[in-house]
């Protein structure tokens, strides 16, 4: 393992299995949560370097609620967040604008399902090596005695 820990929050077991296998084959440690509630609990239990969340879960666009909640949390707001969705394929709805603009979505990366393996891995690498991730790592090291 390369030491990087990823939390994957998605309610589709088949999709979760596929993404988990891709990430583990690339030597990432992956913890899975099948609901936002499980995801929040996992974030309280452990430390992660990246969160990947689906937009559509449960009763609707719960992934957006997860993203907003994480970005408002003092401890978790710098944790890189990658949102993946099949919403355009399912509904024809398309997110317009700059994904990094605060009024768009509070995420650091956005991919549409189905996601090509190389595109996913490149985006994960990019987010794990961003300046934001480096800041988070420094903060964690500074907290240790």
Protein language model regions, located:
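The C-terminal output helix
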Residues: 122-140
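Active-site beta3 strand of CheY-like receiver
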Residues: 47-53, 57
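Short hydrophobic/Thr-rich beta-strand motif most characteristic of the beta2 strand and flanking loop
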Residues: 27-35, 42
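Charged docking surfaces used in two-component/phosphorelay signaling
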Residues: 17-25
């Amino acid at each position: 393992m390369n030491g990087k820990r990823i939390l994957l929050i998605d309610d589709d077991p088949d999709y979760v299995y596929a993404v988990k296998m891709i990430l583990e084959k690339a030597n990432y440690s992956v913890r899975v949560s099948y609901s936002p509630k499980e995801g929040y609990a996992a974030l309280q239990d452990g430390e992660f370097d990246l969160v990947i969340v689906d937009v559509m879960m449960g009763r609707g666009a719960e992934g957006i609620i997860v993203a907003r909640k994480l970005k408002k949390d003092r401890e978790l707001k710098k944790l890189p967040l990658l949102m993946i969705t099949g919403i355009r394929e399912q509904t024809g709805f398309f997110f317009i604008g700059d994904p990094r603009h605060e009024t768009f979505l509070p995420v650091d990366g956005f991919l549409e399902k189905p996601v090509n393996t190389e595109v996913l891995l490149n985006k994960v690498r990019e987010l794990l090596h961003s300046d934001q991730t480096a800041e988070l790592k420094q903060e964690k090291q500074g907290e240790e005695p």
